[in-house]
Amino acid sequence: MGNIAVCPGSFDPVTLGHLDIIKRGAKIFDEVYVCVLNNSSKKPLFTVEERCELIRQATKDLPNIKVESFHGLLVDYAKQKEAKVILRGLRAVTDFEYEMQGTSMNKVLNDDIETFFMMTNNQYSFLSSSIVKEVAKYDGSVKGLVPKEVEEALIEKFKG
């Protein structure tokens, strides 16, 4: 069994901040499963399938990245993949407070799984999918915030 991590998120859409964490995780872990979750409290712009495909395109040069969707408990997905680590990115203290709740619950559900927090690079500390969608919705440029494929997909969604 290798050194496997799961990097979960809604990724609606994937940003360069997300990719920073995914790519840095790929240097540390033998395999990283990017797990696209459908967050019932959010109304997604892209379908789960579209989000998976956009991440696949953005990570196509990284052979140890696998992109899948999952509906259910994250710890169940991690166990299914034989992952012992959940990889999460942190931007600010508010992210930590939110993540701490999820981490604590995951420990209750499966004590064998650890959470690995990685600080986002400063250049992405303000970046979120919500901000990207808001800027794109009003015809603002998201160049330098998302991969080219996502930039094109956003234009298509809002102008299509």
Swiss-Prot record:
Free-text function comment from the UniProt entry? Reversibly transfers an adenylyl group from ATP to 4'-phosphopantetheine, yielding dephospho-CoA (dPCoA) and pyrophosphate.
Enzyme Commission number(s): 2.7.7.3
Write the record's keywords in alphabetical order, separated by commas.
ATP-binding, Coenzyme A biosynthesis, Cytoplasm, Magnesium, Nucleotide-binding, Nucleotidyltransferase, Transferase
Which HAMAP family does the record match to this protein? PPAT_bact
Which reactions fall under this protein's catalytic activity? (R)-4'-phosphopantetheine + ATP + H(+) = 3'-dephospho-CoA + diphosphate
Provide one Gene Ontology cellular component. Answer: cytoplasm
Q: Which cofactor does it need?
A: Mg(2+)
Oligomeric state and partners?
Homohexamer.
BP GO terms, sorted = coenzyme A biosynthetic process
Pathway participation: Cofactor biosynthesis; coenzyme A biosynthesis; CoA from (R)-pantothenate: step 4/5
What organism does the UniProt record list as the source? Bacillus pumilus (strain SAFR-032)
Q: Entry's PANTHER family?
A: PHOSPHOPANTETHEINE ADENYLYLTRANSFERASE
Q: Which family does it belong to?
A: Belongs to the bacterial CoaD family.
Q: Where in the cell is it found?
A: Cytoplasm
Q: Which residues bind substrate?
A: 10, 42, 74, 88
Q: Which gene encodes it?
A: coaD
Give the matching InterPro entries: Cyt_trans-like (IPR004821), PPAT (IPR001980), Rossmann-like_a/b/a_fold (IPR014729)
What name does UniProt use for this protein? Phosphopantetheine adenylyltransferase
Q: Which residues bind ATP?
A: 10-11, 18, 89-91, 99, 124-130
Positions of the site: Transition state stabilizer?
18
Q: What is its main location?
A: cytoplasm
Mind listing the GO molecular function terms for this protein? ATP binding; pantetheine-phosphate adenylyltransferase activity
Tell me which Pfam families the record gives. CTP_transf_like
Q: ATP-binding among the record's keywords?
A: yes
